[in-house]
Design a protein with these regions (language model features):
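N-terminal Rossmann-like NAD(P)+-binding domain of SDR-like oxidoreductases, especially those catalyzing
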Residues: 2-278, 321, 325, 385, ...
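Non-catalytic, hydrophobic alpha-helical segments
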Residues: 323, 327, 333, 344, ...
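C-terminal "lid/loop" region of Rossmann-like NAD(P)-dependent oxidoreductases
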Residues: 307-312, 331, 339-346, 353-371, ...
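Short, surface-exposed alpha-helical segments at coil->helix boundaries
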Residues: 135, 139-142, 256, 290, ...
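NAD(P)-dependent short-chain dehydrogenase/reductase
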Residues: 229-234, 247, 257-329, 345-352
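Generic structural signal for residues in well-ordered beta-strands
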Residues: 150-152, 270, 302, 356-360
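Amphipathic alpha-helical segment in the mid-to-C-terminal domain
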Residues: 247, 285-286, 320, 341, ...
Length: 417
């Protein structure tokens, strides 16, 4: 599927753009009067207060550290060079865009930054390179981006001074906001980090965009986790999202309400996306397919959870290239073909040529949901979105990358890990 370049992001920056149908808008307005939405707003206010109190000293310290890594004439030249579009003169697609990508050294951020650069857009990345998973993988992604002319600033999206400086140096036309604290189970032990990144960080970025001249159009990553305990499948954009099953899901839902408000009050052009279990090369080590691959190759047992009544868990696995092609819209982005976790393991075993040592147990109450299933009809109708990579093909590509990146050879358990 080929998509016109000018359609890949929201229209002219600064214009109000609401993607949902009129009926949906009326439903949202009514929602503000509902008890569930009042709860979400209360959660947001409490979260913002907690974030300020818990992280004030952290922000002061980290801002001083990151400030030492940005600024100066050489740094500004790097920013301008990276942000400059490189489409040929007279291109039918136009002059190109200048895009600020937050979370650029992350899994999805890296792939999106590369795709934007390859089509001739200017790209500047921001990432804090935290230790949620092995930072060396993020640094390797940064090196990959640098080889394609994308400069990634090491900094935190909660640093308003950094964001203001970036918008002062470059009049970005678009912002692709992918920075967030990911993971469902990690939130059980580190709740403050989710409030800090997913709520306070989002607000800091929106404030910077609101004050920028011109105001950039914004695309940001929500999550399929907002559907929470919803038992109606497949999940549709019109389904209820007031039953979060985890703190991560609650922060993403709060983000949707916050962005709606900034669109309503300040006219910011904001488009949100709900990703469904993205996988592929350069992926996140905390994801099941990644950790299964590592443990299978090392001869270690893998833990496979089952739901109530011994029902296998299932996920709507979506290959990264399919996410990239549909990224610039506010729709469910999935594969609409859920696959059970045992089937995922079987496919990995086939491509790794190693039998997994499985340990099957009941799913604990840690915020995970038993299944995800995307209804992509809206994206298909209005965008022409059509995922093309099934799980077997996608995992084959992932395994090829994994074996190469970590230095495995067939039949050997030795690697760089």
């Amino acid at each position: 599927m080929r998509v016109l370049e000018e359609d890949l992001f929201p229209s002219t920056p600064g214009k109000v753009k609401i993607e949902r149908a009129g009926a949906m808008n009326r439903q949202l307005h009514r929602c503000f009067a509902s008890t569930s939405t009042m709860f979400l707003w209360a959660l947001f206010l409490v979260a913002m207060t907690a974030s300020y109190l818990s992280f004030q000293s952290f922000v002061d310290t980290s801002s001083k550290y990151f400030a030492a890594s940005w600024g100066g004439l050489h740094w500004e030249r790097q920013i301008r060079a990276s942000a400059a579009p490189r489409r040929p003169p007279g291109s039918a697609a136009g002059a190109g865009m200048s895009v600020l990508v937050t979370g650029a050294a992350g899994f999805v951020g890296t792939h999106c930054s590369l795709a934007l650069r390859k089509r001739g857009d200017g790209v500047v990345g921001v990432d804090n390179f935290n230790a949620y998973y092995d930072p060396s993988l993020k640094k390797a992604r940064r090196a990959l981006l640098a080889s394609h002319g994308v400069f990634v600033v090491e900094g935190d999206i909660n640093d308003g001074r950094l964001l203001a400086k970036l918008f002062d140096v470059v009049p970005f036309t678009h912002v692709l906001h992918l920075a967030a604290q990911a993971g469902v189970r990690y939130a059980m032990e580190n709740p403050a980090s989710y409030v800090h990144s997913n709520i306070a960080g989002l607000v800091t970025l929106l404030e910077a965009c609101k004050d920028a001249d011109p105001q950039p159009a914004i695309v940001w990553a929500s999550s399929s986790s907002v559907y929470g305990l919803n038992d109606k499948v497949p999940f549709s954009e019109r389904d209820r999202t007031d039953q979060p099953a985890s703190l991560y899901a609650a922060t993403k839902k709060a983000g949707e309400e916050i962005t709606h408000t900034y669109n309503h009050i300040y006219g910011l052009s904001i488009t949100g996306l709900r990703f469904f279990t993205v996988y592929g090369p350069w992926g996140r080590p905390d994801m099941a397919y990644f950790s299964f691959t590592r443990n299978i190759l090392q001869g270690k047992p893998i833990t496979v959870y089952r739901g109530k009544d011994h029902v296998d868990l299932a996920r709507d696995f979506t290959y990264i290239d399919d996410i990239v092609q549909g990224l610039p819209w506010i729709f469910n982005l999935g594969n609409t073909s859920p696959v059970t976790v045992p089937n995922l393991v079987s496919i990995l075993e086939k491509h790794l040529r190693v039998k997994a040592k499985k340990h099957v147990i009941e799913m604990p109450g840690n915020g995970d949901v038993p299944f995800t299933h995307a209804n992509i009809s809206l994206a298909r109708e209005q965008l022409g979105y059509k995922p093309t990579t099934n799980l077997d093909v996608g995992l084959k590509k992932f395994v090829k990358w994994y074996l190469s990146y970590y230095g495995y050879t067939r039949g050997s358990k030795n690697s760089r890990q």
